[in-house]
Structure formats: C-alpha cells, structure tokens
C-alpha cells in the first residue's frame, strides 16, 4: 500500500495521498512546450524512484554490508598530496561508503509501523534517501580528478537536498502522533536516522573542505579549536534571538579552562550549543517575566582534560518540574503551550530560523532540540546530562570525547 501511496492513489481506492516530491504531476496538455517538457522530466525522475519500490535488490545488498567508520585521527592525519591523490582516495571511500549508510537508513524507514510509514511527509524523506542511493550508485567509478570534481558536485547537491530532513521528520511524526504506539521503536529510528545523517554530512563536508586551504583546518577538523570562541559565537546568536522574542536576554559568563585549544570538529558543537543556550535563555526569561530587565546570568564552565571536554551550562530558570524531568530527553511530537510544559519540551522560540547560514537546517520545534543533541553527543562518544534544582535552575553537562586523547576516540 506504500507503493500505492507513491503512485498517487490511497489505500483501497481512497483519496490520493500527497505525492512525495511536492505538487502532483499532471501530464495533461499545457499551454507551452516548456511546461510540458518540465513535467515530463519530473515524471521520468519520479518513475525512477517508484521503480525502486519494485526492484530493491541493490538496496538490499548494500544494506547487508557493514559501514566503515573512520576515527577523526584517521581523517586528520591522512595527509595532503601535491598531486591531489588524497582527494581521489577520499572520494573513492565516500563512493563505497555513502550508499551503504543510506541503504541502512532506507531499511530503517521500512521498519516503521505501516501507518506512520504512509505519512506523506515521512514518505517524502524516505524517497529522498532512495533518490540519493540511486544517484550515488549510478555514478561511475572515480578514476581521475575530473571524475572527483563531478562527484563533488553530486555531493553538494545531495547535501542541499537533505538539509531539511530533521524538520521534515519532526513534522511527519507530529502529523502521525496519534498512531504512535511504541515510542521506543520511534526513538530508536530517530536516533539512528539523525546520527547517521550527522555522520554522512560530516564525511561529505570533510571531503569538500579538503579542497580548501583554510588556516588551522584539515577538512572539517580544526587543529586548534577554542571552546571559548565557539561558545561566544553561539552565545551572541542565541542572545539576538532571545532579545527578538523577549526584548532582553541574560548575560553569559564563561569560566574554567577558557584558554584551552585542541584538535576537534566544530560541526557537532554548531548543532548542539545553540540548542542548549536557547534552552537556558528561554527558561531564564520565562521564569522572570515580571522582571525581564533584571534577570540572572547564565554561567558556562569549560573543563578540559586529556580524555574529554566538558561544557556545563548553568541557568537560574527555575529548574525542571518533577513531572517533566524523566521525559525532557525524549522526542516529543506535540506543540503544547509553554504555560503547560517546561520550556525545554515545547518548541523553542517558535519557528524562527535558528541556524544562520543554513548549515544544518532548523533543529528546533516539535520537542526535538534536546533529544537530538543527546543523540549527537552519544554518537560522538560523549553524553548530555541534566541536573535540575527545582525552584532554582538547571545545570546541563555536555561531555565530548577528544579526537586525540588518551583513550580511543569516537568513529564517524
């Protein structure tokens, strides 16, 4: 019946579901030949994806292969070559690895309960993955730099195509929320899908960045990352959002190992830090609505050692109610009013675009911010923990393993 949905007719002859790729295609005559050609091309593209529902053998074979995860150290010390051979090696690794990882996620979409998998928005994301698999597997073997350059164009296109996947998944699950009976199954699906997406984007962006000659960077790895500087960048961003919504924002004090520098990948911090800072600022402002221009500071402490980096964010936002404490790290698919839920659970700052530059798309709303940050931290060999002092405030502990520390690093 999923196939019937893709083809445009509902189950058992019911009303047609919204097609996966936006407006329904119509092959009726158009007033101009250009319009006709456009729609024929769209129909042809869509037919390829539909055909894949019949012929899944390539996806099935790829899904049975294990992914080959790299440590950041491997990526950092793979070296540069004058003849560009490091780029060919990196591209060939991606050409082998990306289809396998995408096939794993397609298998994950198939495992969803039928009624959820039929949701048009979820189907749209499912199709994005199938289309990506087809484009990647159709690409010929990379033999020279010209092939590698064309492969980079494909990778950029796919990164752009998938930039809104987090928001789409949240919307689709919100639309299907009344059909969700096993929340553990959905949480497992989301954890795997979102962390796999992070890994794929990190690997793909790393390869593209290898073409750049940026000081203190090898690909996406910063060789001298300053936690203080990246925190300050996102503090400024979160304060602007907070001022836009509330007319004011808490001051932020940073202490601890403020001079620390070490090799690290900024990208996961660029996903996680805005969420944690927005949470702290919103909780602070919401709990001081009577005195919005006299609010307590948010305090951030950096602790660096030879195994991991710990960032503690402490707010005086009243803490988390006992009834909400056990579920703040769960994915929530409702949009309840802030007056009836802890600010960390309800959508954060409405639906503003929270990531300038569009690097990751908005990771907000629908109660996805904290659980997604938790999943990312765990994927990177770390953790995200909350300690609530009800009536006072909340301490959030973000722990991330070093890529060149005394213990084995995480794998991407």
Curated annotation (Swiss-Prot):
Q: What is its EC number?
A: 2.7.11.1, 2.7.11.4
| Gene Ontology cellular-component annotations | mitochondrial matrix; mitochondrion; oxoglutarate dehydrogenase complex
- Does the keyword Transit peptide feature in the UniProt annotation? yes
Q: Where is the Histidine kinase domain?
A: 159-404
Q: Where does ATP bind?
A: 279, 315, 334-335, 364, 367, 370
One Pfam family name is HATPase_c
Q: Where is it localised?
A: Mitochondrion matrix; Mitochondrion
Tell me the SMART domains matching this sequence: HATPase_c
**Gene3D superfamilies the record matches:** Alpha-ketoacid/pyruvate dehydrogenase kinase, N-terminal domain, Histidine kinase-like ATPase, C-terminal domain
Chain positions recorded as K(+) binding sites: 328, 330, 333, 367
Where in this chain does the entry annotate a coiled-coil region? none
* SUPFAM superfamilies (alphabetical): alpha-ketoacid dehydrogenase kinase, N-terminal domain, ATPase domain of HSP90 chaperone/DNA topoisomerase II/histidine kinase
Query: Post-translation: what modifications?
Result: Autophosphorylated.
Mark the residues carrying the PTM Phosphoserine.
31, 52, 356, 360
Reactions that this protein is recorded to catalyse? L-seryl-[3-methyl-2-oxobutanoate dehydrogenase] + ATP = O-phospho-L-seryl-[3-methyl-2-oxobutanoate dehydrogenase] + ADP + H(+); L-seryl-[protein] + ATP = O-phospho-L-seryl-[protein] + ADP + H(+)
Sorted alphabetically, the keyword list is: Acetylation, ATP-binding, Kinase, Magnesium, Metal-binding, Mitochondrion, Nucleotide-binding, Phosphoprotein, Potassium, Transferase, Transit peptide
Q: Which residues carry this modification: N6-acetyllysine?
A: 192, 233
GO MF entry, a single one: protein serine/threonine kinase activity
Transit peptide residues? 1-30
Q: Does the keyword NAD apply?
A: no
Query: Its function?
Result: Serine/threonine-protein kinase component of macronutrients metabolism. Forms a functional kinase and phosphatase pair with PPM1K, serving as a metabolic regulatory node that coordinates branched-chain amino acids (BCAAs) with glucose and lipid metabolism via two distinct phosphoprotein targets: mitochondrial BCKDHA subunit of the branched-chain alpha-ketoacid dehydrogenase (BCKDH) complex and cytosolic ACLY, a lipogenic enzyme of Krebs cycle.
Family (UniProt):
Belongs to the PDK/BCKDK protein kinase family.
Q: Fill in the subunit field for this protein.
A: Homodimer. Homotetramer. Dimerizes through interaction of two opposing nucleotide-binding domains. Interacts with E2 component of the branched-chain alpha-ketoacid dehydrogenase (BCKDH) complex. Competes with BCKDK for binding to the E2 component; this interaction is modulated by branched-chain alpha-keto acids. At steady state, BCKDH holoenzyme contains BCKDK and BCKDHA is phosphorylated. In response to high levels of branched-chain alpha-keto acids, the inhibitory BCKDK is replaced by activating PPM1K leading to BCKDHA dephosphorylation and BCAA degradation.
Tell me the protein's name.
Branched-chain alpha-ketoacid dehydrogenase kinase
**What species is this protein from?**
Bos taurus
């Amino acid at each position: 019946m999923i196939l019937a949905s893709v083809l445009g007719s509902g189950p058992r002859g019911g009303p047609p579901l919204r097609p996966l790729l936006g407006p329904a295609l119509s092959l009726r005559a158009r007033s101009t030949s250009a319009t006709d050609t456009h729609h024929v091309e769209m129909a042809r593209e869509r037919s390829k994806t539909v055909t894949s529902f019949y012929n899944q053998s390539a996806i099935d074979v790829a899904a049975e292969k294990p992914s080959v995860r790299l440590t950041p150290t491997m990526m950092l010390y793979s070296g540069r070559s004058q003849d560009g051979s490091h780029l060919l090696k990196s591209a060939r690794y991606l050409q082998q690895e990306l289809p396998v990882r995408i096939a794993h996620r397609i298998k994950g979409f198939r495992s969803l309960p039928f009624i959820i998998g039929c949701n048009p928005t979820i189907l749209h994301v499912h199709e994005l993955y199938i289309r990506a698999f087809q484009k990647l597997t159709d690409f010929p073997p990379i033999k020279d730099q010209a092939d590698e350059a064309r492969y980079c164009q494909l990778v950029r296109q796919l990164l752009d195509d998938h930039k809104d996947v987090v928001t789409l998944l949240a919307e689709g699950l919100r639309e299907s929320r009344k059909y969700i009976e096993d929340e553990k199954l959905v949480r497992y699906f989301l954890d795997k899908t979102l962390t796999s997406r992070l890994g794929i984007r990190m690997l793909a962006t790393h390869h593209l960045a290898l073409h750049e000659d940026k000081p203190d960077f090898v690909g996406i790895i910063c060789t001298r990352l300053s936690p203080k500087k990246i925190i300050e960048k996102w503090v400024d961003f979160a304060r602007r959002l907070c001022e836009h919504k509330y007319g004011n924002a808490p001051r932020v004090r940073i202490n601890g190992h403020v001079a620390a520098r070490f090799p690290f990948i900024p990208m996961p911090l660029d996903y996680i830090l805005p969420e944690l800072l927005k949470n702290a600022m919103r909780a602070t402002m919401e709990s001081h609505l009577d005195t919005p221009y006299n609010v307590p500071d948010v305090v951030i402490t950096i602790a660096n050692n030879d195994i991991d980096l710990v960032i503690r964010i402490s707010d005086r936002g009243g803490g988390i109610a006992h009834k909400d404490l056990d579920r703040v790290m769960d994915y929530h698919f409702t949009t309840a009013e802030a007056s009836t839920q802890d600010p960390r659970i309800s959508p954060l700052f409405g639906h503003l675009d929270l990531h300038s530059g569009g690097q990751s798309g908005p990771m907000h709303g629908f109660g996805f911010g904290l659980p997604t940050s938790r999943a990312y931290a765990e994927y990177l060999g770390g953790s995200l923990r909350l300690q609530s002092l009800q009536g006072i405030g909340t301490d959030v502990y973000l722990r991330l393993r070093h890529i060149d520390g005394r213990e084995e690093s995480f794998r991407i």
